[in-house]
Amino acid sequence: MADPKSSFLNVYSILKSELLQDPAFEFSTDSRQWVERMLDYNVPGGKLNRGLSVIDSYKLLKDGQELNDEEIFLASALGWCIEWLQAYFLVLDDIMDNSHTRRGHPCWFRVPKVGMIAPNDGVVLRNHIPRILKKHFRGKPYYVDLLDLFNEVEFQTASGQMIDLITTLEGEKDLSKYTLSLHRRIVQYKTAYYSFYLPVACALLMVGENLDNHTDVKNILVEMGTYFQVQDDYLDCFGAPETIGKIGTDIEDFKCSWLVVKALELSNEEQKKVLYENYGKPDPANVAKVKTLYNELNLEGAYADYESKSYEKLVTCIEGHPSKAVQGVLKSFWAKIYKRQK
């Protein structure tokens, strides 16, 4: 039995070669080479957690029955659609954030000769998703639901990104806007729907379920996505760069991070003044003052408290779900993220 990741990568190669021969467009050698290089650079490079989660969830929903080759292929194809969606978001996000590196390599728009061709590449990535769905799912009873699901989640993610961008607008930096409810809204829409709900929703559609009957599952997964982002915010400041694989810049970037929101909540007037004067400034001295304040306020303790409360709440919700198979899916997600260090 090949390991799941290499079987999954084989499906990527099949989907890529189908897209490079799409009959709707007459490729020249140059354009075919461009798209192939763009795909290889942006789609398969990450941890592939979202994509692999579709297969894991589908297996659990099938109560551990052996999947046949077609079922594995289709679940993998949907997993890749999520990875394509992620690639599309990241290519465009990196331009908006003026980022330099992604997954240890230069961002796509920083690659020589790419530059501002990257926004169009993002649009191409987005348009590959319905091409894959049409080719492999058009005859399925849940085809329209799949299209609808991807469209809805993309809309939610783009809207979350918009709230994030307009909150950190240059010249309009206002810490008083930063509240737990704003943080929650950004996270829920920008991250939780596509990273946590979408893989499970794909698997539910494949086993013939109606998503309208699973709003409880959606709510639990969005809650998990929120917890995941709070962890991310915490690790950005308190995680070891060699473990998390990046140097955190949330303080410099004036991000609506859980840490700054919590700090505002716990600060007295004097401490608030330190935040207002130093948060969002690139100078290391300003950043150091914010970090010192975070330690004074014992944000590590506040995070540990948040973590244990989230654990109790989520485990209670999961164990209250009537379906053991669905519980299995939710528990497998939870096991991947609880107490992670990176």
From Swiss-Prot:
Its cofactor is Mg(2+). Pfam families: polyprenyl_synt. Its main location: cytoplasm. Dimethylallyl diphosphate binds at R102, K190, T191, Q229, K246, K255. Transmembrane segments: none annotated. It is found in: Cytoplasm. Disulfide bonds: none annotated. The keyword Magnesium applies. InterPro entries: FPS1-like (IPR039702), Isoprenoid_synthase_dom_sf (IPR008949), Polyprenyl_synt (IPR000092), Polyprenyl_synt_CS (IPR033749). Mg(2+) 2 binds at D93, D97. Mg(2+) 1 binds at D93, D97. Its EC number is 2.5.1.10, 2.5.1.1. Keywords: Cholesterol biosynthesis, Cholesterol metabolism, Cytoplasm, Isoprene biosynthesis, Lipid biosynthesis, Lipid metabolism, Magnesium, Metal-binding, Steroid biosynthesis, Steroid metabolism, Sterol biosynthesis, Sterol metabolism, Transferase. GO terms for molecular function: (2E,6E)-farnesyl diphosphate synthase activity; dimethylallyltranstransferase activity; metal ion binding. Isopentenyl diphosphate binds at K47, R50, Q86, R103. The keyword Lipid biosynthesis applies. Catalyzes the sequential condensation of isopentenyl pyrophosphate with the allylic pyrophosphates, dimethylallyl pyrophosphate, and then with the resultant geranylpyrophosphate to the ultimate product farnesyl pyrophosphate. Belongs to the FPP/GGPP synthase family. This is Farnesyl pyrophosphate synthase 2. It comes from Lupinus albus.
